[in-house]
Amino acid sequence: MNTLYTLFATCPRGLETVLSQELESLGCTDVQVFDGGVSCRGGLEQVYAANLHSRTASRILLRLTKGTYRNERDIYKLAKNINWFNWFTLQQTFKVKVEAKRANVKSIQFVGLTVKDAVCDAFRDIYDARPSVDKAAPDVRIHAFLNERNVEIFIDTSGEALFKRGYRLDTGEAPLRENLAAGLLLSAGYDGTQPFQDPFCGSGTIAIEAAWIAARRAPGMMRRFGFEKLQNFDKTLWSDLRRRAEAQTRPVRAPIAGSDNDRRIVQTALDNARRAGVDDIVSFSVADAQSVRPNGENGIMVSNPPYGVRLEEVRALQALYPQLGTWLKKHYAGWLAAMFTGDREMPKFMCLSPKRKIPLYNGNIDCRLFLIDMVEGSNR
């Protein structure tokens, strides 16, 4: 019998709609968008497929229970009533993380200890022993979410966060997480059939994610997952899903290029591309952005140009933006330029009018993805 679970997939804020489309395409049902994630229903196949195939999710959480509470004692009872031994063994380690929004509790840390005690006591009642906690590298991660009246307890099927694809060991000074980079590409309409460029490529994350989209490469192929350590792990199903994922890859026809004016960071991008298995697909070079020229017609540029945090940085960059606008208008007619930035004034200083402004967060930084159709001459 195929048990259906209630799932919650977390993602960078602003990518919830893109993630919901991914989950629907993987066969999830009852898909609902919330701030910071998407809830849905699915069986083990959808759990495994979401971890393997979602480009934008951060974690796939599986709900074990939901209830109301008045105090920490209610949370303890709810957590202790879960059949934890159906999910992991006494010999495995675990960790509890609690998140709350307007919760009626004295301390989030105390709720974490309460859930931890409930798990340990549930095991102790059966085995007269308790599993150990490992905060650094647990076998099993448990998440509790509280609001004013309700508590939900989940088991994390992902393990390490899904943006950890396995190819990026070295990071640039301001690395863009892989799932956010993929989300920028999908939000811009990139599907791998158009020429692609990133003239501010940094450590290459956007270009590498573009190559994986173009090759139909599942982003989870290089890593392990939390669900592989759970008691209900179906090895046959997982092997079949991986085999199908390998069979769906395709040759990349359209060119993909990244460039940066920092030789050291371009070397990092080359190393990352090699580990990602796309060094024969992505062309990286050392170049000042304004010396770069299109690698085809009607392409897509997705880039995270430098933007300032301190006032003097902002002023220096805002002097550069008009030059970038002139360069784009002169050389990139027919292209879509998707600029991701924390500087909402960027298009104005570039003298360009975006057709769409998509609010997104890079960590805690409130950013915008500006989609600009490039036409010859002035675009204002």
Swiss-Prot record:
Q: What is its main location?
A: cytoplasm
Q: Which domain of life is it from?
A: Bacteria
Query: Is 4Fe-4S one of the keywords UniProt gives this record?
Result: no
Q: Where in the cell is it found?
A: Cytoplasm
For biological process, the GO terms are: tRNA methylation
Q: What is its EC number?
A: 2.1.1.173
Q: Which Pfam families did the record assign?
A: RlmL_1st (PF22020), THUMP (PF02926), UPF0020 (PF01170)
Q: Which CDD domains does the annotation name?
A: THUMP_AdoMetMT
Q: Name one GO cellular component term.
A: cytoplasm
| Family, as annotated | Belongs to the methyltransferase superfamily.
Instruction: Briefly state the protein's biological role.
Output: Specifically methylates the guanine in position 2445 (m2G2445) of 23S rRNA.
Q: What is this protein called?
A: Ribosomal RNA large subunit methyltransferase L
What lineage is this protein's organism placed in? Bacteria, Pseudomonadati, Pseudomonadota, Betaproteobacteria, Neisseriales
